[in-house]
Every structure is written in C-alpha cells, then in structure tokens.
Regions:
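Catalytic alpha/beta active-site cores
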Residues: 1-201, 219-229, 257, 263-267, ...
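Conserved, mostly hydrophobic/aromatic
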Residues: 42, 91, 212, 259, ...
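Short, solvent-exposed amphipathic alpha-helical segments in soluble enzyme
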Residues: 84-89, 207-210, 281-282
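Anaerobic metallocofactor- and corrinoid-dependent redox/one-carbon enzyme cores
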Residues: 150-156, 163, 230-238, 243-249, ...
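Glycine-rich and small/hydrophobic secondary-structure elements
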Residues: 173-180, 243-261, 283-292
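Short, well-ordered amphipathic alpha-helices
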Residues: 176-180, 206-217
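Short glycine/threonine-rich loop-to-helix capping motif typified by GTGT followed
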Residues: 196-207, 234-247, 275-284, 309-321
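Active-site or pore-adjacent capping/gating segments
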Residues: 251, 262-321
Length: 321
C-alpha cells in the first residue's frame, strides 16, 4: 500500500464550528440544556473542552500515595487498641481514634502501634492532636506548642450544609490564620468532607491544593500540597436500602484519592444509626484496599492531571472561593 493513500487532508475545526454543528443536529433544542454540565453547587461547564480556553493548572505534584485512614469508635482503650492493630494488619496505614484517651488510657490505646510508620490521630472538639509528632519514646509532649498544631475542620462545615465553595473559602482563611499565629505548614491539617458529586469533589480537593500552594508561595514558604484528610460525608446516608451507601462511599473515596488527599477515611455506612460496626468497618476499609490493589491508583499519583474539564472546574471553585 502506498503511503500516499494515508495523506488525507483534514480541516481544523474551531470550538464555534463544533457548537454550530451540534446545534444543527439538536434541531432547535437548547445547546445548554443538553451539553452544559450543571452541578448541585451551581457550577456550569461545557461538556466539551479543549486547550483553547484552558491554561494548565500549576499544582504541586503528589509525591507519595494516599494513606488508608481507619476510624476506631470504641471508647474502651484496650478494645480500641485491639481494633486498631487488627485494622493495621488488614490494609490500614493510619488510625483515627474517635475518642481522645488521656493518661494511662492513652498508653493502652497506642500500645504496639509504631506511629512513625502508621500515624495516629484523635478527634477533638477544637484541635486535631497529631500523635505521631508527640509520641516519641517516653518524651513528654511540648504542650506550649499545642496551639500551633491544628485541624481546619471543613468536614464539620459541610455536615452543617455548607457548599463546596464555602468549605474551600473557610479552610483557606483558617489556614492563613494558623500560619500567622506561628504554626508550621507541616503541622496544619485540612479535614475535608467528600460528598458524592464525583467530579465536583475531585475539583474541590484540587482547588484546596491550588490555593494553599499559592498561600505558601506568597508567604515565602516552599510551595507544597496541604495535608489533606478526606472523610466521606456519611451524615446524609439513608438507612433505607442501606447497602447502596457502599456505592456512595466508593464514589467519595475515588474523589478524594484522585483529588489528592494525603489521608482518606471512609466511615461505616451505618454509623449514624447503628452501634454494630464491625462488618461495615471492614467493608469500608476494603473499599480502599480494592482501589489500591485492584485499581492500582497508588501507581499513578496524579491521575487527574491533564483533564481540561477538571482543570476548568478546579479554577472555577478556586476563583469563587
């Protein structure tokens, strides 16, 4: 076969040419009704994107895979420790104690957990104590630094009805306040609620990364990704057809991971109405095990990069925040 047979000229088509052709095919129906994506948060984006109006986003690259954060709700220190150790032996890479333990109970809860390998967090009403920074051998924590280590709790805001843009705006402003008070970037954690609006949540997480890297650049620090802890928004999970919540949790996990969180936690789908969490906790943990071991997303750290659609949505959220 002659190579000349492949020399078929193709004329370039502009975005406007494409839209005109589509409008013709729609036979009078509205282009925007069919081919503009609208999110529940009010974002409107053309479903067809190219490089014409999309400059690449300068996001700091992710350097390591996310860590599977397993929640422990038991209020007994010994039982909580046993659950944590079991989770770490079955795929978990970090632990979240929903109850804070003090004194001897704290020692029991953290027994045999190497916090240099598996970070341990505890929930608090006002501060996120990062125990892997404190629990080093028998050294007492420097309590004078406690107010310089904290959590920006965007999750709580989302649970109370805040929009994606409101969460981002609040989180960044609180982060700036912590920096101004003397906190170091590596000690600031952003707890972000991950809902089920798949693309919007990916873009929201990337918008947090984009804005925080800009904050660090302006303040003279090295541009880095924020320390993001993604937690699925399980507060709205219905009890009816409860196993459908597994799909909702999977969507949230993928959004957080593709968006670039450092830690991802999936709460049990029946957390809001049941105390029997052993089975649902295992399933929630295995959602991320499957994403990691079968989806292999830990091998592609920046999978969302290069998407014109996600880049434009990321910029919209960042601009409105």
């Amino acid at each position: 076969m002659n190579s000349a047979d492949f020399d078929i000229p193709f004329s370039s088509q502009s975005t406007e040419d494409w839209k005109n052709r589509v409008t013709k095919e729609l036979k009078g129906k509205s282009f925007s009704d069919f081919l503009e994506w609208r999110s529940v948060d009010g974002f409107k984006i053309d479903s067809w994107q190219d490089s014409t109006d999309n400059a690449p986003i300068d996001l700091p690259p992710l350097k390591s895979p996310w860590k599977l954060l397993h929640p422990v709700y038991n209020e007994d220190a010994v039982t909580a420790n046993a659950e944590a150790l079991n989770a770490l032996m079955n795929g978990a890479e970090s632990i979240w104690f929903d109850k804070g333990f003090l004194g001897a109970a704290e020692i029991l809860a953290h027994k045999d957990i190497d916090t240099s390998v598996a970070p341990v967090f505890t929930r608090s009403s006002s501060i996120f104590d990062v125990f892997q920074e404190f629990l080093k051998n028998d050294v007492e924590p420097d309590l004078t630094q406690a107010d310089k280590n904290g959590l920006i709790n965007g999750l709580r805001l989302r649970e109370r009805g805040a929009s994606i843009v409101q969460e981002v705006a609040y989180s960044i402003s609180q982060g700036i306040s912590l920096l101004n008070s003397g906190a170091k970037n590596e000690n600031i954690y952003f707890n972000t609620g991950i809902g089920t609006s798949y693309l919007a949540e990916i873009a929201k997480t990337r918008a947090l990364r984009l804005l925080w890297s800009n904050v660090l650049r302006v303040s003279g620090d090295t541009e880095e990704n924020p320390r993001l802890i993604g937690i699925n928004l399980s507060i709205d999970y219905p009890q009816a057809d409860e196993y459908n919540n597994i799909l909702r949790a999977t969507t949230s996990a993928l959004s957080g991971i593709l968006g670039g969180v450092e830690f991802m936690m999936i709460e049990p789908w029946n957390r809001q109405w049941s105390d029997e969490l052993q089975f649902s906790s295992r399933i929630s943990r295995n959602i991320q095990n499957l994403i990691r071991d079968e989806g292999r997303l830990e091998k592609n750290l920046n999978a969302a990069d290069g998407s014109y659609f996600l880049d434009q949505l990321t910029q919209q959220i960042a601009k409105e925040a």
